[in-house]
Design a protein with these regions (language model features):
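Bacterial N-terminal signal peptides
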Residues: 13-23
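GH16 jelly-roll
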Residues: 29-264
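Bacterial N-terminal signal peptides that target proteins for export
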Residues: 2-14
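Sec/Tat signal peptide C-region and signal peptidase I cleavage site
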Residues: 24-28
Length: 264
């Protein structure tokens, strides 16, 4: 997400996290494997927190609120909604963050992307200056203006590296699909529905190497993101659904979203 958000906004977001003490937890040793199936429970479970704050800058048009998160038969729904007239931003959106950091390993999400001009839905890892680190980031970002594609990118040691907007071969807003990436010391490989989709090699590019925090969110692009996401009209409403998120370190055989559901 933060690869396309102005630096001042990035600092504001991270500053809020620092003020709430999350940064202290993030400095702990990276956590081990976990599997969160949102389609079989009605709560986030241990290890997650919901963002609930406003970023006071004209460059970012979305305030995070707990009220934009709900459970349905499909899993965890994150919504983008027009904010009330008295609100400080035009939109209310939703964001969920992992409390502890993760590092090298496999990351998976089963989700349905949000559709709509200027809408962004995502899964990514992030750390940055307010955690005492240079910015490192790995992303899957769905631009609601064309959900037959996905934006994959990474940030390493504070350097913005080239992103790719790639054809999926299907519409990611029509239903759930499995998205994954392997983050390893010498490469990052993105996957879609179990098939290799895109890769970058360490011999060709600088790669992120600092443990980060898993985040997923839905938000509205504005003039600052116009060339990338488009601008969301002020009456825009959109939803993304998340069924499952999992992580395991290299060499681990812990269960993942891609494994069959027991008894399913």
């Amino acid at each position: 997400m933060f690869s396309n958000v102005p630096v001042g906004v990035q600092r504001a977001v991270a500053g809020v996290a620092l003020a709430t003490g999350v940064a202290l937890a993030a400095q702990a040793e990276p956590e081990g494997a976990f599997l969160s199936r949102f389609d079989t429970q009605d709560r986030l479970g241990e290890g997650w927190q919901v963002s609930h704050f406003t970023i006071r800058t004209d460059d970012f048009r979305t305030a995070w609120t707990r009220d934009a998160i709900a459970w349905t038969a499909e899993g965890l729904t994150l919504s983008l909604l027009p904010a009330p007239e008295e609100a400080e931003t035009p939109f209310h959106g939703a964001e969920v963050q992992r409390v502890r950091r993760t590092h090298y390993g496999r990351y998976e999400v089963e989700m349905t992307a949000a559709r709509g001009m200027g809408v962004i839905s995502s899964l990514f890892t992030y750390t940055g200056p307010y955690y005492g680190d240079p910015q490192d980031e790995i992303d899957f970002e769905f631009l609601g203006r064309d959900t037959t594609k996905v934006w994959v990118t990474r940030f390493a040691k504070g350097e913005r590296l080239p992103g790719q907007w790639l054809d999926l071969g299907f519409d990611a807003a029509d239903g759930p699909h499995l998205y994954a990436f392997d983050w390893l010391p010498d490469r990052i490989v993105w996957y879609v529905d179990g098939e290799e989709f895109f890769r970058v090699e360490g011999e060709d590019y600088t790669l992120p190497d600092i443990p980060g925090r898993i985040m997923f969110n839905v938000w509205a692009g504005g003039p600052a993101q116009a060339d990338w996401s488009g601008v969301a009209p002020e009456d825009m409403e959109a939803q993304a659904e998340y069924r499952c998120i999992s992580y395991r370190p290299p060499e681990s055989s812990a269960p993942m979203c891609s494994d069959p559901v027991p008894g399913g």
